[in-house]
From Swiss-Prot:
One GO CC term, this protein: cytosolic large ribosomal subunit
Keyword Ribosomal protein on entry: yes
UniProt keyword terms in alphabetical order: Ribonucleoprotein, Ribosomal protein
Keyword Lipid biosynthesis: no
Similarity field: Belongs to the bacterial ribosomal protein bL17 family.
Source superkingdom: Bacteria
Official protein name in the record: Large ribosomal subunit protein bL17
Protein species of origin: Mycoplasma pneumoniae (strain ATCC 29342 / M129 / Subtype 1) (Mycoplasmoides pneumoniae)
Length: 124
């Protein structure tokens, strides 16, 4: 029964979805999505914030590969926002920069929905 958990999308689609959602969370602070996508995006988001805690050329290059333009920021502005405003909040936090809050099933297809948001560093 290994066919049950396969989402039925190509790997390029999954990578692009994660890139879009990571950029949206960094720009807006939170997003509403399905539970499975939120958990998948949370892994990459926490890794990018960990990289952004040390500001050097290599980390900026690696982070830039995962960011996309949003309505508020282009890629360079979003990267500067991450390195100058988001990452310093979590400087002394060893991990757990984001959280997933379950919302319940979506009306229509009963898919489990969730909110992916950045945690505030002062509320441990």
């Amino acid at each position: 029964m290994s066919y049950i958990n396969k989402p039925g999308k190509t790997s390029a689609w999954r990578v692009m979805t994660v890139r879009q959602q990571v950029s949206a969370v960094l720009a807006y602070g939170k997003i509403e999505t399905t539970l499975k996508k939120a958990k998948n995006t949370q892994k990459r988001l926490d890794k990018l914030i960990t990289l952004a805690k040390v500001d050097n050329f290599n980390n900026r290059r690696q982070v830039k590969k995962w960011l996309l333009n949003t309505n508020l920021f282009d890629v360079d502005q979003l990267m500067d926002h991450l390195f100058s405003k988001v990452a310093p909040k979590y400087e002394k936090t060893p991990g757990g920069y984001s959280r997933v809050l379950k919302l319940g099933p979506r009306r229509g297809d009963a898919t489990e929905m969730a909110i992916l948001q950045l945690t505030d560093a002062k509320y441990k």
